[in-house]
Amino acid sequence: MNRFDFWLVMKNPEHGRVVDNLGLCVIVTPEELIDLPSLMVAPMTTSREDLPSRVECDFEGSKGYIMVDQIRAVEKSSFIKKLGELEIDVQVTLCDCLQEFFAL
């Protein structure tokens, strides 16, 4: 598991909202903290919304959006399968978005 990996994450049936039932996510935990029992992830969506907290990317030939405004911690036991890695240019854009989103 590494920062910027796409992972399929086990859906949580206890939550009713679609965003809460994770699915495809991107790991955003810094590499220095990757050995912790839970990781920070940003879920993906195919719904386009003009929000500054959404980062556009391509996944398996389809356009998607990383939802920085929906970041949450997920236990490693919920990670099902690695599906790929973000392209370098999208990694840079995501880091810029994270810095802006969490600016104090």
PLM-predicted stretches and their roles:
Residues M1-L104:
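Conserved functional hotspots at enzyme active or ligand-binding sites that engage polyanionic ligands
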